[in-house]
Amino acid sequence: AAMGIEHINLAIAPALGPDGEAYLEAVQRQGWVITAGMMNYDYEDYSTLDTIKTTGGIAPDAHWPASGEAFAKAAQITARLGATAILMHVGFLDHADAAYAKKFYDRVRYLGDAAGEAGVTLLMETGQESAEDLQRFVETLKHPNVMLNFDPANLILYNKDEPLSAFRRLAPWVRHIHIKDALRTTTP
């Protein structure tokens, strides 16, 4: 707050580690309003578009159900901090692979249930999918505790959509927005 920053989107994963309580105490001393918690996993690899497609969010089987359990704890911490939402990149949506899609829907449903039990909403971050695919996903899922964090720069970085038209399509589910600069990738 001394720097004039009053509202933040807070990374929650550090609160799950061995120094978690010290982290939370330091955060609370700042007096910030936390607009949303944010969950990420140390196994996620954002170095290329291909690596994040296979390592992002809750998609990797090698890390499930531990990733879901960690999310549930993060949702509880988010609520404890007074925020009403926790956001994350849940992973790559792929409707073309029926088995993968079913697993993915089930996992996101689990996250939505865990968020609801904690009294917060899961906000899926836009990025690796078109607005049309994401709309299809949330309409099919129909979960009251699963909404969206709209990140227009991710749509540009992943070369998936035009931000304004994407926002118009997704607006009914948008509850939080990230703003940052981005350049469209030249290597998809």
Short names for language-model regions:
Residues 1-2, 19-23, 63-77, 159-168:
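Short, acidic/polar
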Residues 1-14, 74-77, 81-82:
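Catalytic domains of carbohydrate-active enzymes, especially glycoside hydrolases
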Residues 7-8, 37, 105-188:
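Acidic/histidine-rich catalytic cores of soluble enzymes
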Residues 7-30, 89-96:
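Glycine-rich, proline-tolerant flexible connector loops at the mouths of alpha/beta enzymes
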Residues 12-15, 41, 90, 174, ...:
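Residues that line or immediately flank small-molecule/substrate-binding pockets and catalytic motifs
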Residues 27-44:
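Glycine-rich, aromatic-flanked loop segments that form ligand/cofactor-binding clefts
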Residues 42-47, 96, 182-188:
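Flexible glycine/acidic-rich beta-alpha junction loops that bind and position SAM and/or redox cofactors
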Residues 45-148:
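Active-site acidic/histidine proton-transfer and metal-coordination neighborhood
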